[in-house]
């Protein structure tokens, strides 16, 4: 199966959540693998792919397909560096990796609607749909997340994609909206959906509990 870690925006913690899940599944003895097909903003090495692949003891080169220098959308980078992103190659590579693992975690770049190609638009929702993947959406815990999270949910729904759930990441106990965001988001969506919360600096038990709850929800999805 493919668990696709996407997000409402960039910089909300997709890689961090991916590391938590990979470490948890590996420690459970589950054959888990990871790939981030496109990473942008790369200086010397792709930091996201490197962080997660190092947990698996694999070279980062096995965990990324396209690397771009500037911190822009994949499509903008492809124009800037004059590289044609082969989406069929990405899908083929991911499907091949899926066959070799019990769980393949795929990490997107930026949010769910970030363009990979245009005319026609190919974004991360397109990849999720094409791969029959199960999307997990990472979002900020604080002010602004209701708008971003609901729009992300609504966009996925318009593509007939139901997310496994949302992780409201970075709860810091100071900003007041964080205490109500989870249940208000649930009310806005108007159907049951998993919404988890993770502290800004979670301890090991919190990280394990999050991964365990996500893993259990997959079995019941």
From Swiss-Prot:
UniProt pathway: Cofactor biosynthesis; biotin biosynthesis; biotin from 7,8-diaminononanoate: step 1/2
Residues that, per the record, bind ATP: 11-16, 48, 107-110
Keyword presence, Electron transport: no
Residues given in the record as Mg(2+) binding sites: 15, 48, 107
Compartment(s) where it occurs, according to its Swiss-Prot or TrEMBL record: Cytoplasm
Record note on quaternary structure: Homodimer.
Protein name (record): ATP-dependent dethiobiotin synthetase BioD
Species the sequence originates in: Hydrogenobaculum sp. (strain Y04AAS1)
């Amino acid at each position: 199966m493919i668990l696709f870690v996407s997000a409402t925006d960039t910089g909300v913690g997709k890689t961090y959540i991916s590391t938590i899940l990979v470490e948890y599944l590996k420690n459970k003895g589950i054959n888990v693998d990871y790939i981030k097909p496109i990473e942008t903003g790369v200086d010397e090495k792709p930091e996201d792919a490197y962080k997660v692949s190092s947990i698996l003891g694999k070279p980062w080169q096995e965990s990324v397909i396209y690397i771009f220098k500037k911190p822009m959308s994949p499509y903008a980078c492809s124009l800037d560096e004059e590289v044609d992103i082969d989406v069929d190659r990405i899908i083929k590579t991911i499907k091949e990796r899926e066959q070799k693992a019990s769980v393949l975690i795929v990490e997107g770049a930026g949010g769910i609607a970030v363009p990979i190609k245009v005319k026609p638009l190919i974004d991360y929702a397109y990849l999720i749909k094409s791969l029959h993947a199960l999307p997990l959406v990472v979002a900020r815990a604080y002010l602004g997340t209701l708008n971003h999270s609901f729009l992300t949910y609504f966009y996925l729904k318009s593509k007939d994609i139901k997310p496994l759930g949302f992780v409201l990441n970075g709860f810091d106990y100071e900003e007041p909206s964080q205490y109500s965001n989870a249940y208000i988001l649930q009310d806005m969506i108007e159907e049951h959906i998993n919404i988890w919360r993770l502290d800004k600096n979670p301890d090991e038990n919190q990280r394990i509990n999050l991964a365990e709850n996500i893993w259990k929800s997959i079995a019941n999805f």
